[in-house]
Structure formats: C-alpha cells, structure tokens
C-alpha cells in the first residue's frame, strides 16, 4: 500500500506534482489519466523510487520508498517506464529472465519456480514465439509485451505501468487489459497504469485518478467520472457519453 503525504516536486519554479494526501491500496486496478504534462509519469516515477520529492513522504508499506535497497524494492514493485530501453543484441527470453534477478541474483541457479514464472509470463503476454529474437529486431508493440513479461516474471505485488498499451494494436490492448485484470484477481496484486484511452480506463479500472497541472483533479470510480460535470475539461475537448449494453463509451464531439 502507498501513502503520499504533502508531496511536492518542482523544477525551475514550475511545480510538476503537488499532492497533499493520497492512499493507493494493495489490490485492484488503478488507472491514471490526464493530458500531456499533467504529472502522470512524475507520479509513477515517484512511486517507483526513481524520483524523490522535494518535500513530503512517499511510503510503501509504511516505509519510505527511496530507503529501500534496489533489489529489495524489486521484490515488491515492478516498474515499466514510458520509454523502455532497447538493449542491443539481448534476446526476448534474456530480458524476461531479468525479472527473476530480485529473487536469485546473478550467481544462483534457476529453480523450477523461476522457469515456471518465465514460461508463464511469456505465454500470458504472447511473446513465447519470440523467445530467441533480439529486442532490436521486433516491433515496438512486441517489445512492450516482452517488457511486460519481464515484470510479470518478477512476481511483484505492485505493478507500475507507464502507458503500457501505447505501442499495441487494438487486439493486444484489450488482451493486455484482460491480463492485468486477471493478474489482480489471481495474484491478489495491485496495478497502477497510465493510459490515454478513456474508454479502456472506464471499462477496466476499479479506480481512476485524473491529474491536471500536477494536482489531483479527480479520484473515484469510473461511474463517478462519467457523471463528473466537467469531464470535457480534463482533456480540453468536448466529449459525449454513449450508453451501450449497460456500459458507457466516450466519444469526441467534432
């Protein structure tokens, strides 16, 4: 579980993020929305221990995130950045195997649970057939799925994903979201994902947090977001709510 208290981060007099109080539970799928530059990636980097606030505290399970040793933190938190590295000549399977480093280190032998975690995560993300391919010879979407496989192999109880569907085709976007929902249910874990697709957020999220200019503009359920009187203000464009078979979709009004 995360707790943020009086958190503020600024750069050159510009406030990137300012959150008085925020609690993120240890279970469920939380989607973070907001326009470009609203502070979404900054928030995720802070949760992952990649950024330290100028003031305030970011606590994970009642301990300061930046006080964890990297390997110990990796047992609890798996993080996919927005710009994923592309190591030259590394094969997909080798990348996925890195997910087990927190548990085995570099020198220990693989155990059966390591091999099982690696194989299962590659099957779940549809990259098993790419195991021997180099990362720089597969597509951006395939590379994104390979990174997700590494995170799943890590077996952390908190997944932090910065735009995990940005390079995926439509079918794999929904496959990804179904997989994340299944992980939450099966592993009793938590997922915090940044998305730009409002419809995906409304369909799959348990909770939505929307940022605007570095502050929390909305925090609640998808249903509550749909009825928010200023929903169009979130992206600065007219939106229309379309009811469909007991659910809702959002359309841009031309």
Stretches found by the model and what they are:
Residues 33-35:
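The feature captures the beta-strand-to-loop junction immediately N-terminal to the Walker
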Residues 48:
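Helix-to-loop junction immediately C-terminal to a conserved catalytic motif
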Residues 56-64, 73:
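Conserved ABC transporter NBD signature motif
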Residues 109, 134-138, 142:
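Conserved ABC ATPase signature
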Residues 159-163:
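Catalytic Walker B motif of ABC-type/P-loop ATPase nucleotide-binding domains
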Residues 213-214:
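Conserved ABC ATPase "signature" C-loop
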Residues 234-254:
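ABC ATPase nucleotide-binding domains
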